[in-house]
Regions:
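Alpha-helical transmembrane segments
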Residues: 1-38
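Membrane-interface segments of envelope glycosyltransferases acting on lipid-linked substrates or membrane lipids
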Residues: 10, 66, 78-80, 194, ...
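Short amphipathic beta-strand/extended segments in non-transmembrane regions
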Residues: 32, 47, 51-123
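Short, well-ordered beta-to-alpha junction loops that form the rim of enzyme active sites
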Residues: 34, 80-83, 161, 173
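Structural beta->alpha junctions
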Residues: 35-39, 46-57, 91-96, 173-178, ...
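Extended serine/threonine-enriched, polar tracts that run as long, contiguous segments within proteins
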Residues: 44-45, 212
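Mid-to-C-terminal secondary-structure elements
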Residues: 108-122, 133-234
Length: 234
């Protein structure tokens, strides 16, 4: 696969792109930010891997600029950020609960994962830029926890494993596909199995205290007619 440096960020960090064909189908370019390594033995002797700063991340503005420059080839980015595992407990019935894994995602991530919406809406760019406390939950979680009630517009409170409590408003329900999330543990009762709850990725950064404005790892999504090699040569 080809690798190309698209920009120099800060003084010691460079962004590289590796052209790949994603296993889920469709053209993607997997991107990551890493330090520029020393070129000589003398430099290696005193070199220390630098810490990331806000200026080192690939910003949303950079991504938007790339999409604007190549609208026929680039459709967006898919990125995720693990916020934590936790539990939602019905305040009126402690026996009614749901275990979730909170993932911060970009608006394009559900399409990237080939997940279809069941009800409501997906997360939007406005949700992301506004760092809104909204979420999209799995249909199987919605059916069990809300017991037939419409979950759209409902507020849920998640207590994470480290004791943090996060409140979100449900704006959408996606169709859960176990094949896309890996094997299940048959020893765990179905009621206790965790499902992924998606929130805006910028919201997840803020809740973690980092409040970073950019991305360290992401998948650049290319249109069906785009050529991967040509895209990485821009």
């Amino acid at each position: 696969s080809s690798v190309i440096i698209i920009t120099t960020i800060g003084g010691s960090i460079q962004s590289t792109l590796t052209a790949t064909m994603n296993s889920l189908g469709g053209n993607t370019v997997s991107a990551y930010v890493q330090a520029r390594y020393p070129e000589t033995d003398d430099e290696w002797e005193t070199w220390i891997y630098p810490e990331m700063t806000d200026e080192d991340y690939v910003s949303q503005e950079m991504i938007d600029g790339l999409i604007a420059a190549y609208p026929d080839e680039v459709s967006g980015i898919a990125a995720e950020n693990y916020l934590g595992g936790g539990q939602i407990v019905d305040p009126k019935d402690s026996d009614n609960y749901a275990n979730v894994v909170i993932e911060g995602i970009t608006p394009e991530y559900l399409d990237f994962m080939k997940l279809d919406m069941h009800a409501g809406r997906s997360l939007t760019a406005a949700d992301n830029s506004g760092k809104k406390r909204v979420c999209v939950i799995a249909d199987i979680m919605a059916e069990r926890y809300f017991n037939g009630r419409d979950p759209i517009g409902e507020q849920i409170s998640v207590t994470t494993s480290d004791g943090s409590i996060f409140d979100f408003v449900v704006v959408g329900v996606y169709e859960y596909n176990q094949a896309l999330f890996g094997k299940i543990d048959p020893t765990i009762p179905e009621k206790d199995r965790s499902t992924q709850m998606m929130v805006p990725i910028q919201t997840s950064f803020k809740l973690q205290g980092s409040d970073q404005a950019g991305y360290e790892y992401f998948n650049l999504l290319l249109t069906p007619l785009a050529d991967v090699d040509q895209a990485t040569n821009h």
